[in-house]
């Protein structure tokens, strides 16, 4: 039996904890879960009720235990207790009956539901009422339960109670018998697989700690969904609390609103969340037209917001304005929020973390951190350093905070990634780190960091300069797909010219929609060649329009928010694709990779672009052997049976290499800018200067001969 605590109330509820420990010990060899303070129940206009213990297993079914500390058996108190038990029992039963996958027939379930009362301070069992006063009586009753159901049914039951079934439902796909082998049918099966939480996700979403919490994992581990459920849960349990949900990628806004709404409506039987006053979903910056965390914080603290035009004069504009805010308030601003939830936290400078901490009460700050999304940041974040400054040198120490609640976790690692099939994820990581490049570009700092992300270090020490072999843990990539059904998971096209690359992309998109039955919104196109992205998308739109395929270009000037539009293929930059995904992704213009193969920036872009693809990845570029380097590294990965087998280099040495390369690059850029300035002053074009240089070089070579 695995125990999970979702509330820190256990500290004062010793009798309940004692019962949990006794049940856990007696049934330690039985597969199942013991959940403390689960699920939260909200009836219309009534207070939230939470069962104290819920046990779920194949041989016990669902057992709910409600605890009351009454000292004396009084009829009035007992009647109130019985009513509470009845409300919980009815809620559990009706919630499960709403799920067609759990119904045996019109009136019964595939899993039994038993609700018990526990009054440890009384001396008499009320057996007829299933109310007991001792642990031994509870255990004796549980022993008599004779249940037999499947693990699938148990997991489905928990999913129904935790509101995971309110996740975005798989799209309606009209598929006939003749479509059973199409990509659309496979996608439908995969979407069904991931429509519930695993244990780590459940713990992350429903744990309510009185203090800070970090949730981290790979892209696709469900962090945004988890944070949205947490926001909805906080709003339900603490209706007067003001909850801030902030994020980095503007295109996520609609998705976040939709998820919080779905979860909250499911929890409260149809009520709408109060986005106006209590749940504030805001982008980090904001302005006069659009609310934002920084802008609103300034207004609330009597500070004039710094404009973007002014801020960009100081380098990193957003970092600058956040630092100025922290200095202006001396890290002690007005506490505007009861809880602050930060999504995509890896993309923010530490100054934004500090701004958020300064405007929330009691350090109720929860951040979701993608450990490899920002490939520059391969060293594990240290919260003490993240939150420390001259006003508070200590920062936030999660280890010390954890000691207050030893049965709970304030630093949760999500080991599983649901976004990509394993092959795509491994290709993305291999290219992102330069595993099979002639020089390693970056790596994780030690074995534990790899293991936290769902990998197994088969050989070697990742903190040293030595050969290491690393493989993906099967359980960490749970998308179950028959390999024979995704033989074309990754396809690559080297086009002779630009026009033929565009023709191929348009033809493949048309085939995916007409033959493979994918919906247009299942498909996204991301351009790696950002210099030519306008040209790519403009011409691709024309080709697709000729095939009656609509497009949604999130790079258009009039774009506001959202990544998907029903009936449209999405065209996106890498930046706006972050945090989003599509079943089939075309990463185009990849010929720019070869010349920048030693650049961390380019490797980061490739990793981000590739990991947007859930099942099918299409890669293209223009020019003969334009993808030679990329193909070489991918083939090396395949030859090594999709394991990482490489000479490791400690992260501090890799950083030194990168800094030296960056310095050389900066010198080259400075020279180039000087050359441009000189050409303008002298009235000589750069092309003419290069022509003169080439001619002079040839003349010098002749003299040498």
Language model: regions and residue ranges:
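Conserved helicase NTPase motor core
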Residues: 181, 185-207, 212-216, 281-284, ...
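Alpha-helix-centered segments that form part of catalytic cores
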Residues: 179-192, 315-327, 470-497
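Conserved helicase motor core of SF1/SF2 NTP-dependent helicases
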Residues: 214-244, 248-273, 285-288, 339, ...
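Short, flexible/disordered intra-domain loops and linkers
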Residues: 44, 74-83, 292-315, 378-390, ...
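Surface-exposed acidic, glycine-flexible loop patches that form ligand/cofactor-binding
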Residues: 102-106, 331, 514-518
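Accessory nucleic-acid engagement/destabilization modules that flank
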Residues: 1-175
């Amino acid at each position: 039996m695995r125990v999970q605590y979702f509330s820190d109330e256990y500290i004062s509820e010793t009798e309940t904890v004692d019962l949990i420990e006794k049940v856990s010990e007696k049934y330690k060899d039985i597969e199942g879960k013991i959940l403390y303070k689960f699920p939260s129940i909200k009836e219309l206009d009534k207070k939230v009720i939470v069962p104290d213990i819920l046990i779920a297993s194949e041989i016990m079914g669902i057992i709910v235990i409600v605890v009351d500390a009454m000292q004396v058996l009084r009829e009035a108190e007992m009647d109130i207790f019985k009513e509470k038990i009845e409300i919980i029992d009815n809620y559990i039963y009706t919630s499960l009956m709403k799920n067609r996958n759990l119904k045996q027939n019109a009136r019964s379930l595939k899993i039994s539901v038993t609700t018990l009362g526990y009054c440890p301070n009384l001396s008499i069992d009320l057996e007829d009422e299933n109310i007991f006063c001792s642990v031994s009586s509870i255990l004796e009753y549980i022993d008599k339960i004779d249940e037999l159901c499947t693990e699938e049914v148990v997991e489905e039951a928990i999913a129904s109670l935790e509101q995971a079934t309110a996740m975005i439902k798989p799209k309606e796909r009209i598929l006939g018998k003749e479509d059973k082998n199409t990509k659309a049918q496979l996608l439908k099966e995969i979407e069904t697989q991931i429509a519930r939480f695993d244990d780590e996700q459940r713990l992350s979403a429903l744990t309510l700690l009185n203090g800070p919490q970090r949730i981290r994992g790979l892209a696709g581990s469900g962090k945004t969904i988890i944070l949205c459920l947490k926001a909805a849960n906080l709003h339900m349990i603490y209706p007067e609390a003001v909850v801030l949900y902030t994020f980095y990628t503007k295109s996520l806004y609609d998705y976040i609103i939709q998820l919080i709404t779905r979860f909250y409506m499911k929890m409260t039987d149809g009520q709408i969340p109060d986005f106006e006053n209590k749940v504030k979903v805001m982008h980090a910056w904001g302005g006069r037209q659009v609310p934002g965390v920084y802008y609103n914080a300034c207004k609330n603290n009597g500070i004039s917001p710094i404009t973007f035009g002014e801020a960009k004069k100081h380098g990193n504009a957003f970092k600058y304005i956040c630092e100025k805010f922290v200095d202006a308030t001396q890290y002690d601003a007005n506490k505007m929020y009861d809880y602050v939830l930060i999504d995509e936290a890896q993309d923010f400078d530490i100054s934004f973390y500090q701004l958020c901490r300064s405007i929330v009460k009691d350090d109720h700050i929860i951040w979701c951190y993608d450990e490899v999304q920002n490939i520059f940041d391969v060293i594990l974040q240290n919260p003490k350093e993240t939150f420390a400054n001259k006003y508070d040198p200590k920062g936030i120490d999660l280890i010390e905070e954890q000691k207050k609640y030893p049965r709970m976790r304030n630093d949760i690692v999500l080991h599983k990634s649901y976004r990509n099939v394993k092959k795509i994820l491994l290709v993305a990581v291999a290219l992102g780190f330069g595993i099979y490049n002639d020089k390693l570009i970056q790596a994780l700092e030690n074995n534990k960091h790899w293991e936290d992300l769902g990998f197994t270090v088969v050989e070697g020490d990742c903190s040293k300069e030595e050969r290491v072999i690393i493989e993906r843990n099967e359980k960490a990539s749970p998308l179950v797909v028959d390999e024979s059904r995704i033989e074309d998971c990754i396809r690559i096209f080297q086009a002779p010219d630009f026009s033929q690359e565009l023709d191929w992309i348009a033809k493949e998109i048309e085939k995916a929609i007409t033959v493979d039955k994918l919906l247009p919104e299942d498909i996204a196109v991301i351009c790696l060649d950002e210099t030519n992205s306008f040209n790519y998308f403009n011409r691709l739109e024309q080709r697709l329009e000729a095939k009656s395929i609509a497009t949604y270009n999130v790079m258009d000037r009039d774009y506001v928010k959202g990544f998907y539009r029903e009936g449209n293929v999405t065209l996106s930059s890498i930046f706006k694709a972050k945090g989003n995904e599509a079943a089939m992704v075309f990463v185009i213009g990849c010929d720019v990779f070869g010349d920048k193969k030693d650049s961390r920036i380019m490797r980061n872009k490739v990793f981000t672009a590739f990991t947007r693809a859930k099942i099918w990845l299409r890669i293209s570029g223009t020019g003969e052997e334009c993808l030679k380097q990329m193909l070489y590294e991918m083939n090396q990965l395949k030859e090594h049976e999709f394991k990482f087998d490489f000479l490791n280099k400690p992260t501090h040495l890799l950083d030194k290499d990168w800094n030296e390369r960056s310095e050389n690059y900066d010198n080259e850029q400075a020279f180039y800018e000087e050359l441009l300035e000189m050409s303008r002053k002298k009235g000589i074009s750069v092309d003419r200067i290069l022509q003169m240089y080439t001619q002079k070089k040839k003349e010098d070579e002749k003299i040498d001969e």
